[in-house]
Every structure is written in structure tokens, then in C-alpha cells.
């Protein structure tokens, strides 16, 4: 009888421990999902005031000829060496403001940068086409 109670207590302890790990996993996943933030023009401009922030334009060279956000660095998302170029130019501890033409490529670029270890990514939701 004592052995059975002991086994049941061990089982309950294991279940409790698994619940803790599951909660930690859920919290970690939530933080990862929201570490890339879509922002509107007003918020993007506020973030630009941070002197340590870096602005990354992921459009093609032809698109950049039409204009760009002042102070931005251009690395085309379609470049074979996209990630290595960004890593060479932008430290991973910096706030990175990312934009493309309409918001699609910048969202994909942010996913790739997040996987590479960038923590503070902000994606201009309307892209350069919606920039004022």
C-alpha cells in the first residue's frame, strides 16, 4: 500500500513538472512571435529617433532609385547573400527598422533575421509605398 502511494506521488510530481515546462514553452513561443512588430508610419518615425536604431531597406536596387527613407541601408531581400550582408552591417543587439515596397518582403526578412538572432525588429506595415 505504501509503495502504491509513493508511486502515485511520483507520478503527480512528474505531471506537475511537465505542466511547468509546458507553461514556460508557451510563454517563450509567445515572446518569439511578438518580437517582430508591425508598426505604422507614426511609430516607425518615433523609432527612427533612437540614435542606435538602424533602418534596413530590403527592396531591389531598381526600387531604391525611386526613393528611400533617409538613413536607410539597402540589402535586397532577393540577394543570395542577404543574411550575411545584413549581419556584416548591422549588429544583432541593435533596434532594426525594416521596410520594403508594401510590407510582404519585410515581414519575410524579419522572420529570417529573427531566426538569425536579431531581437528588436520593427516592420513598416505599409512599406515605402505608404510612407509619408
Task: Give a label for each model feature.
Residues 99:
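Short, surface-exposed ligand- or partner-binding patches at beta-edge/loop junctions that are enriched
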Residues 26-34:
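Hydrophobic h-region of N-terminal signal peptides that target proteins for export
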Residues 11, 26-27, 66, 112:
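Enrichment for repetitive, rod-forming helical segments
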Residues 1-18:
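Short, Lys/Arg-enriched N-terminal segments with co-localized hydrophobic residues
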Residues 55-57:
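Structural scaffold elements adjacent to functional motifs in cytosolic proteins
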Residues 7-8, 23-25, 42:
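Short helix-onset patch at the extreme N-terminus, typifying the N->h transition
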Residues 2, 19-21, 33-53, 62-95, ...:
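Rhodanese-like catalytic fold shared by cysteine-dependent sulfurtransferases
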Amino acid at each position: 500500500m505504501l509503495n502504491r502511494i509513493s508511486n502515485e506521488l511520483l507520478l503527480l510530481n512528474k505531471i506537475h513538472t511537465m505542466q511547468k515546462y509546458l507553461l514556460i514553452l508557451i510563454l517563450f513561443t509567445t515572446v518569439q512571435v511578438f518580437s517582430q512588430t508591425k508598426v505604422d508610419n507614426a511609430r516607425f518615425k518615433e523609432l527612427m529617433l533612437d540614435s542606435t536604431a538602424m533602418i534596413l531597406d530590403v527592396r531591389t536596387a531598381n526600387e531604391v532609385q525611386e526613393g528611400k527613407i533617409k538613413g536607410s541601408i539597402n540589402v535586397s531581400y532577393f540577394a543570395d547573400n542577404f543574411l550575411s550582408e545584413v549581419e556584416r552591417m548591422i549588429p544583432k543587439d541593435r533596434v532594426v527598422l525594416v521596410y520594403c515596397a508594401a510590407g510582404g518582403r519585410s515581414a519575410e526578412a524579419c522572420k529570417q533575421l529573427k531566426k538569425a538572432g536579431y531581437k528588436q525588429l520593427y516592420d513598416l506595415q505599409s512599406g515605402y509605398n505608404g510612407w509619408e
